[in-house]
Structure formats: structure tokens, C-alpha cells
UniProtKB/Swiss-Prot annotation:
CDD domains: HFD_CENP-S (cd22919). One of its GO terms (molecular function) is DNA binding. This is Centromere protein S. Pfam families: CENP-S. Coiled coil: none annotated. DNA-binding component of the Fanconi anemia (FA) core complex. Required for the normal activation of the FA pathway, leading to monoubiquitination of the FANCI-FANCD2 complex in response to DNA damage, cellular resistance to DNA cross-linking drugs, and prevention of chromosomal breakage. In complex with CENPX (MHF heterodimer), crucial cofactor for FANCM in both binding and ATP-dependent remodeling of DNA. Stabilizes FANCM. In complex with CENPX and FANCM (but not other FANC proteins), rapidly recruited to blocked forks and promotes gene conversion at blocked replication forks. Keywords: Cell cycle, Cell division, Centromere, Chromosome, DNA damage, DNA repair, DNA-binding, Kinetochore, Mitosis, Nucleus.
Amino acid sequence: MEAAGGEQRELLIQRLRAAVHYTTGCLCQDVAEDKGVLFSKQTVAAISEITFRQCENFARDLEMFARHAKRSTITSEDVKLLARRSNSLLKYITQKSDELASSNMEQKEKKKKKSSAAKGRKTEENETPVTESEDSNMA
């Protein structure tokens, strides 16, 4: 049973490597067209291998940051910690994180308004309407 799981894992890793290699090739083609330079197949392969290994390191670091904080979920704070050595990347990630946080707050507020409006309608529906005869007794 473990052998099948290991084979499945290796298959997924190979697919991921292929996807990274393909994406690297596409990016190299774009740069080649833009800058008028050529990339050999060996160069593309080397860049994709370095990229894949760096992604593995990032994944391990993110897992360790979360584990150190006694969490099982990686948060945006972990990603910011990972990007701390690159000021421009950290600035970009912080900006996007703030945008996501404000967007999430807006969505929560909309949900609250919708639910409170729905509750208000339900209480209005539950109240019995006052008829004129009952109203005249009050006077």
C-alpha cells in the first residue's frame, strides 16, 4: 500500500516538474522575443530545475514557520516572513495581502447587512397586523 502511495507522489512530482519546465520555457520565449536573445534548451532546463528546487525550499520554510507558530495552516504572515529579504517582493505581498483583507471585510459587512435585513423582514412578517377595530379600542 505504501509503495502505491510513493509511486503516486513521484508521479505528481514529475507532473509538477513538467509544469514548471513548460512555464519556464514560455517565459524564456517571451523574454527572447522581447530582448532579442536566445535561450538554449540546457539553459531553460537549468532555470526550471533551480526554480523547482527553490519552490521546494519555500514550501519547507513555510511549513516550518507555521509549525513554529503551532499552526497547521500557512498564513499570509508566513509568506511575508519568507519574502522579508526582498524589499520589493515584501512590499508587493504586503500590498496584495492588505487588498485581500479589505475585500474580505467588505464581503463580511455585506453578508451582515443581508442577514440583518432578512432578519428584519422575518420579524415584520411574524408581527400580526393591527386591524382598525383593535386600533379604535386603543383610543
